[in-house]
Amino acid sequence: NGVLIDKGSGEFNKHGNDSWAYDQRGFDFIMRDQFGYNYAIKDQIFSNKSRDKFQRLILKAAANDNFSFEDGAHIRDGYVHSLSQTAGLRVDERSYTACIVYLNGNYWGVYELREKVDDPDFLDYYYDQDEEWVNSPNYIQYLATWGGTNTEYGAPNAQPNWDTFKNWVLGNPMSNQANYQIAKSQYNTGSLIDYFLINIDITILLLNYNLLIVLL
């Protein structure tokens, strides 16, 4: 509505993979207090979230759901994440709102403004997992997988700790209640269940289409 909410200065990092095939590429914005304006964007940007301070945000033009890519709809990823939040599922979503991006004062396109989940501020706000100090025993452990798995926080212990837990789960039957309770005490099994539920629900039309092809 033309009302200035907040302003600041910061840096930009590359974000995404598929989106970099287009002019409207994805990027991360990082507000820098050192630049003398502000340490964070201070506003409740996402209507379904109470959080009102953001140092890092994602801006992307729907990635491979872009208008020019195979009948792209430009809203599907944001829709699924918003649906998950509305349903109260136990998964981490990139909160979504639409925005307009201008590059050097020129209109650049319709973008998505998204909450960044692999961010210490996100983990602190929603899970009370503060950064503390690097390499401390309580430092955040965070793995990210896209093609391969890499450690974003908590090196060198994060990957070995995950591998140890994963191998224990694979080596012990989860049908055993005692084993399952041990796993549940260390892993949010409800989050995994909800993740599969929403994926099944969203892809069911594609599944029916594939079955139809097989039957024909």
Where are these regions (language model features)?
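Short, flexible loop/turn elements at secondary-structure junctions
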Residues: 1-2, 14-16, 31-35, 61-63, ...
